[in-house]
Amino acid sequence: STSFSVVDLIHPDDEVTQAKTDGVAYRIVERGTSDHTIDQAFKRMAIEAGATLHYKSRIDEKDADIVACGPKDTSALALGEIFRTSHPNHIAFQLNDKLAPGAYSYLIIIDGVGLICTCLWRKQKKSERFLNECIATYQRLYPDIDMEPIKRVGGKGDFTLNGFYPVPEPGQHFVGESGGLQDFMWGFG
């Protein structure tokens, strides 16, 4: 993980203020398929403990010891662009309905790789335009950030506080979003 003690908070009028602390305010943990990510560390630990992972196949939930499926419904959409940069580590967060209707956008730069992302609470017509406008806004607010695009990414999410969660079979565990566990601030499983 990478520790941060400051975050830029970008107001809807593009004023930038900073929230800071003398200690560690938060840590960013990288997800994904690269060997050094938390996902792969958990995968290695599970396999070493004897777990069998099922990819691109469907088994009945009642036959699984651990149920760790992502969201079944979609109430949120995330669109982003990953890029290379020489800019130092940096985090910025913005609430602006013009860039992310009903939600938020953010900029993360860690160790030479950046991500600008917009989150939308529902699919919008021409959703990609919100990402393009986000990128243009962050480039205007941070003109010293050089960006060499790598790829565009996207995902879906769902957030509910009153969803139906089945009673586990004996010895069965529901984890993450399958277990109803969500970050109450941002809704991540």
Which residue stretches match the model-derived regions?
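Active-site flanking residues adjacent to catalytic metal/cofactor-binding acidic residues
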Residues: 175-177
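A conserved FAD-binding loop/helix module that cradles the flavin
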Residues: 182-189
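Flexible, glycine- and charge-enriched loops at secondary-structure boundaries
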Residues: 32, 124, 186
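Short hydrophobic/aromatic-rich motifs at helix boundaries and adjacent loops
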Residues: 12-15, 106, 172-173
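Aromatic side chains
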Residues: 26-27, 104-106, 188
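A conserved beta-strand/loop capping segment in the N-terminal third of enzymes
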Residues: 1-41, 49-51
